[in-house]
Amino acid sequence: MKLSEMQKYKELVSAHKRSEISNEELQKTFITDGAILSNLYQEMEMDSDSVDCHDDVNYTKDSIQLHSHTFYEMLYCRSGNVQYLLGAERYRVRRGDIIFIPPGISHRPLYLDQLAEPYSRYVIWIHPEFMKNIQQFLGFIPLSDPVLLRTQDSGWEYMER
């Protein structure tokens, strides 16, 4: 399922219920409506052959299952304090952090505590062929391992303002 299709479906269901629904509720609705999605995030496809961008917010401890993608994913944490499983490593992610996830790397957020504030993030998906072009332009950048970049207390903090 493409991201745009999922967002349209989510808008329709939210309008019908007259309130925003969580991703977990959306997955239950898919199952109820006869769609078979074992893992909503694993099934996602890019709309573009270059870059897709969207923002995502979790207000509850949605059960996002371990999943991977066929494209690169970058997450910029706008709010929230969660742990993130990247491959076999676990990281504490907080406001201002950037996560870079190569294709095929299993990942998921871990909601170990009650969410005191929503887990809000900007998400950028980058098609592998487009990333290859970027690498040719910028020179060699090792992109086979996940990366967590902290921006708090650095010159990169201006991105949030």
Regions found by a protein language model. Name each.
Residues 1-85, 91-92:
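Generic protein-terminus/edge-of-domain signal
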Residues 41-43, 127-133, 152-153:
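Short, functional N-terminal and low-complexity linear motifs
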Residues 50-143:
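N-terminal regulatory/effector-sensing and dimerization cores
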Residues 139-161:
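Amphipathic alpha-helical segments enriched in hydrophobic/aromatic residues interleaved with Lys/Arg
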